[in-house]
Amino acid sequence: MSNPAKPDDSVGPQTQLGWLNGYRSAVSLTFDDGMDCHLDPVIPILEDHNLRGTFYPVAKGNWSETETSLPYLERFRPAVENGHEIGNHSIHHWCSCAARLDLESSDVSNHTPAGLEYRTLAELETELDQACQRFEAIFPEITLWSFCYPCYNTFVGRGTSRYSYVPLVAGRFFAARGGGEMSNLTNSPYHADLHCLMSWKCENRKADDLIELIQRTNRDGGGWNIFTFHGVGGGHLSIEQAEFEALCHYLQREKDTVWMAPLVEVALQLHQWRQQGN
């Protein structure tokens, strides 16, 4: 999943609003894990409000290079055809196991635990390459891909053997979304790492809370808020459907002030603005 024109993170001093073409801020709504609720009710709600989202399903299931079928991904084809973004969320969805109080069973042949603490960069490299093969086989028309770090984790190993796998992602994808450890997770057009973008977790949040984040960014001018959803109206890490609908209603109402677009589209515009020497 190569991208010959990869983002350059260097920018110079100029008004932040320049990259937004007159909007006060940008917003991307992202949805992790390819849940059933993303197909219904999320996509119909988005389309009822003339909004487009970014969906990160996992390329799980049996597959070989001679096959071009993977039902878990193919069910998102109508979303792609309607202008939504589909991004890569890996195959095995490896996460940190640091909080587990039992011995996690292995899912690899060397019988080590499955958490990122026990993975290597070589294993992540293979995981990313194989995931790229699967996504590209199912959606060959997509030329610009983004990646979503499972569980927001961007590392492998522990202690002196702990390494970031962000560089591996940067070599394969145009942009990538993580989480963030700061109190303010709005992405700056000057400083944001397009291969480790920060995002706001939305589980158990109220629409008013998320709207206030957008309004605060509008007052400051020029930032990019990325919201991460899992369950909507049910499922794990869920937000109530009514709260999600209220957020979508706000974004539709503020369409002349807030640029709401899929993650890879916002990343591309920011990249192009930076390439102009801004």
Please report, for each region that a protein language model flagged, where it lies by residue:
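Catalytic domains of cell-wall/extracellular-matrix polysaccharide-remodeling enzymes
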Residues: 41, 63-71, 95-103, 110-205, ...
